[in-house]
Amino acid sequence: MINSVLALGFDDTKFNWSDLTPIAVEHKKLSSENENNVNKAIDANTSVIGIYASHDIVSASGLIGAFLTIDAASLLGKSSVGNDDQWVKDAGALRDLLRVTRTLKSEQKEVITKTLGENAYSAFNALIASASRQTKTILVGPGAIALGFVALRSNSKLKDYLLVANTPVVPAITEAIKFMGSKVIMNTKENVHPLAELALAVSAVKASEL
């Protein structure tokens, strides 16, 4: 039974959680304290951990693509932008990033921080802590899904507790989800506020338990 949510890394200044769900939520920014935040929340019977790391498709694809043999253009997919000039720019940036990440893929912390930043490694550790304690962990956005992908490459036992909130229309993310085998809660492919996406996903999971 879902009674409360710990939301890590979400911006709660532009969206009112209670507009979508009455379930209690606690917010924490991404920091080195996140693993401790997760353990404390679970000890206090929090039932869901939501994680958001980044909405940057190039960065997330750079992390996922480090472990794949797919080229930059195919990882991005033509439909990911819809603007040819921006797509060419993104494909070039991703190609350059992959040259770096593919040499770092054996160094977990380095490849995560190089793509998604220092705080993303804190989110990664929080994600592992949550799933290891058999707590539903909802991944929102490309960055969090990429972190889940990396986590499952190291520990497949986490799969049953990692849930993907929604499916972005980007091949790199699709490939990651396919490898993970995790449940995708929604398949709207709509671009909504990350916190709204978490609220909708939590409500869907709660409804499925009734």
Predicted regions and their residues:
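N-terminal loops that bind phosphate or other acidic moieties
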Residues: 1-210
